Amino acid sequence: MNEEFENFSIYGFSIDYPKECRVEFNPKSRRESGDVVFHFPERNKIFLSWGDLEKATKRFQTIEAHAENSLETVKKTGNVKNFEKVSSDTVNVRSHKAAYNHVRLEQMTAGFFTGRRAVPRDACSVHVHCPDSSRYFVIYALFPHESVEKQEKAIMAMTKSLKCH
């Protein structure tokens, strides 16, 4: 493990996360499904969610379909404009095929003094289906465009470190 990372482990899976992060575990999380947030000092966040693989595979024939559904959900939220897919790829996570996506969008924010304005953001996600643990995992983040390189690097390092079974 890189000295810039520490290990988070729970319910039989683990992931390395940047040491600078504060970890927030959702108290409603269970072995079957849940999420954890890794908070960066500059207020960016990377999320790790997991759930029942059987439920996911009933809804989605492929990992790509699961990932595409997540992108469509983001696209349809009322505060998103100018949604553009920057890249998509297949990556390997512990012998499992995983779907990686990077999108660019404008998030509409409302400020008391500034009114509604469009803030450029990037989002990255990795979807993994693990039959060995009967779970799916999603690593994702939404962050300011100027921090793309740092956040994408962190997400890919976390993805490579995920021990899903």
Task: Name each model-derived stretch.
Residues 1-6:
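N-terminal low-complexity, Pro/Thr/Ser-rich intrinsically disordered segments
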Residues 16-19, 41-43, 94-96, 128-136:
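Short, solvent-exposed coil/turn segments at beta-strand boundaries
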Residues 21, 133-165:
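Surface-exposed amphipathic alpha-helical segments
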Residues 11-74:
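Secretory pathway targeting signatures of secreted, lumenal, and periplasmic proteins
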Residues 8, 38, 91:
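Short aromatic-centered micro-motifs
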Residues 68-130:
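Signature of long, low-cysteine stretches enriched in small and polar/charged residues
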Residues 45, 118-122, 134-136:
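Short, mixed charged/polar active-site loops
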Residues 55, 107-108, 145-147:
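Solvent-exposed loop/turn segments at secondary-structure junctions
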